[in-house]
Amino acid sequence: MGEEREATRTEYKLEMDSELRFEIENKNEKVTVTLMNGHAELFGTELVMRKPYEFGVGAKVAIFTYHGCTIELRGKPDVAYVARETPMVQYLNSNSALEHLRAKAEQDDTQGPVVMIVGPMDVGKTTLCRIFLNYAVRLGRRPIYVDLDVGQGGIAIPGTIGALLVERPAPVAEGFSQQAPLVYHFGHTSPSDNDVFYGVLISKLAETTLERLEANKKAKYSGMIINTCGWVKGGGYRHILHAIKAFEVNAVFVLDQERLYNELLRDVERAVQIVFLPKSGGVVERTKSQRAEARDNRVREYFYGSKMPLYPHSFDVKFSDVKIFKVGSPALPDSCLPLGMKREDNYTKLVAVQPGPQLLHHILAVSFAESTDDNVIQSNVAGFICVTNVSMEKEVLTILSPQPRPLPQTILLVSDFQFMDSH
């Protein structure tokens, strides 16, 4: 132990309106950040002086200072540099405009701004949402965060959309507190896998969150910040237009793509403000395998936690104790459809799934619906389980669950997403 060398220390002096960016790709590397003097923030969350913050593999970090500061890095990031060109001041100005609208809403007892962030993949949409949310709660607001990105599933897990009342800034190295989120099961990681069902869920989530805004004065004045996925052409663009109407959006921030900005100016009602913002130079493009790894990590965190470990439960569930469904059945030619049924109905149909080996490693959503007489596809979910073993002989599924037995409800919805539990 005595021969173990102390981690490399590097000190960075940042000038006003600059940021320190670093990335960690090495699985065995940990980098610790400490603010030595001055003021700095990470995506809108303030760093506490002399408190060490630890980051691991996959971290892509940008620590910004408005007034100048000194930061110490311990460890060896793959990339680390200071950038003086950053859009943070523009992001802050945009936030000031939103805060002005919130103050006016409070004064007039009307609804605060409902804001949507759009743009192609890898332009920093989730980061900008986080910045806006953190700034809002630092000013005493309580905005609702809505995530329509089924690819990464920032509020629950991939294959879902959801909403969350944000009451405190996100911890520096983690996401927002996940207490009592409203989550809907989609079951795929791309909206194009079931276009019709995705549209139905957007409408349902919009209806529910707008009701919640009305019921909570503080949230009503604070408004919403809506994150979207990076599919911005064709069907993806139609979903953006649908979401703008469904959520009664009054401001859209377009990151990086002028074509999308101009299309929205052309197609959206004039009452909706369309604002173009540049992406940060620190945004990193992710490969397909990096996206898949990020999805896996998200599910692993759901069951096992991140900084604070969680201890999930493993137990058996009898086939006869649960009802398993998937949403959507293969499309039939029009001539084969039952009388009065439309082709679209196939995509939102509840299809019974027989328990069997095909469910191994699949994520199942536990629906709040109590029976199939309820509108199951539009019911929110209590949480998720993973099938770790199937015994046809005993007719039981072995599942990984965040809670001990029994399951809170018996209707389970199959996700395309698979998670290989390596614990």
Swiss-Prot record:
Gene Ontology biological process terms in this record: mRNA 3'-end processing; tRNA splicing, via endonucleolytic cleavage and ligation
Origin: domain of life: Eukaryota
Range of residues in the leader sequence: none
Database matches in Pfam families: Clp1, CLP1_N, CLP1_P
Binding site for ATP: 19, 60, 122-127
The protein's name in its UniProt record: Protein CLP1 homolog
Family stated for the protein in its record: Belongs to the Clp1 family. Clp1 subfamily.
